[in-house]
Amino acid sequence: MFYRLRFAVFFFLVLAAQPIISQGAQSRGAARQTNKAQVARMTRRPDTTHPTPSYIYTINNDLANNGVVALKRSADGLIAEVLGSPFSTGGKGLSGGDIDEQGAIRVHGEFVLAVNPGSNSVAVLRKQSGGKLMAVPGSPFPSGGSHPLSLTVHKNLVYVANQAAEWGNPASAPNLVGFHMDSDGRLTPIPGSRIEFPRGAGPAQVEFSPTGENVVVTSGFQGENASRIHSFRVMSDGRLHEAAGSPLAPQGASGTVGFSWSPMGDRVYVSNFRGSAITVFSVDRQSGGIRQVGGAYGDNEQAACWTAISADGRTLYVANFVSNSISVFDVGTGGKLTPLGTTKRRAGTSPDTKDIEVSKDGKHLYAVGSGKTEVAVFQIGADRMLTELSAGHSPVKISTGQNTTGLAVD
């Protein structure tokens, strides 16, 4: 009897322990499965079947209700205006057909910044789903001057170039003003950041170097004022300090408008509409000191005004306003330029070709047709030359506005 009772107790204990052992085994098995799943997620290749859509932005420059035009870009380069576009900037555009600027609109993370030249302000809009944009609280913000036409942004610093006058009509002293940008997109002026330029020689473009250490500004294209290239060192408080050799007058050409930084931030390639040429400048990354490298590189076209550079820095594209064309240069050792050829825009009303940008994947180039309020699309070939997409796909008409201004690719 005693042995049967002891066996019964032992059997009961074994049965009672089985769920515990089973649960422990299940827990260890589940842990192993979880670890495998985590590793799989970490090593999983990105989904390329549904790539994140990219967008292109320009400004319709509407005189009563300025707006940012958003166009969705597909992998084959085709673009189509986003539903609800244009998105109001809360300001006004500027009259006059020949608005010389580069950098009127910029993409910075989740924000799009755009100038309101007709109401002296800068709009900051936040990206929404489907390519839509919405103004941040407080936008638009005063630009700190008259007729803002170019801006640049790096991290939390923004600089705005106020040109102060329409073509040939000086009104007040043009300037450059700095702002701090907070995480919500609000702009606050930086005390002591204002830098004034001579009357009639307002800035055409302002842009941080790729690393944000220096800022270059082109100016002096209005009337017969001598052109100037300004180089500034960015100080710890966000203000700018003019560097050695600045300002510098380009040799061999004049009428500076747009420019592009080299990816390394040690050179700038500057367009000059008088003589339709490019001048190259070396910029010391530590001090911001600037000097011209070589002479002027002509493209045998009319009014070279806007530029774009490939991500690898090997190819420079130049938009010729009067010729309605885009010239292509090889960028060699030391910044030496060699012309590769020129592509004419299809059936544009001359003069019309303005801002240009290269897509992030390097496969397409986009060009603003300002007077006809349209954007042209070009495929970039293996030889780096441009071929405009077929009629019906290029150019793409903008729905509203006049004298379309600026171009930014997300």
Residue ranges and their predicted role:
Residues 46-51, 89-108, 142-157, 196-214, ...:
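Beta-rich, blade/repeat-based domains predominating
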Residues 65-69, 121-123, 168-177, 224-230, ...:
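Structural motif
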Residues 71-79, 125-133, 178-187, 231-241, ...:
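Short loop/turn segments immediately following beta-strands, especially the blade-tip
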Residues 61-63, 73, 117-118, 127, ...:
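Short loop/turn segments immediately following the C-termini of beta-strands
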Residues 79-90, 133-142, 187-196, 240-248, ...:
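Beta-propeller fold detector
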Residues 133-207:
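Asp-box/WD-like beta-propeller blade repeats and closely related beta-sheet repeat scaffolds
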Residues 58, 114, 160, 217-218, ...:
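Residue position within the beta-strands of beta-propeller blades
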Residues 370-410:
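Blade-level signature of beta-propeller repeat domains, shared across WD40, Kelch, NHL, RCC1
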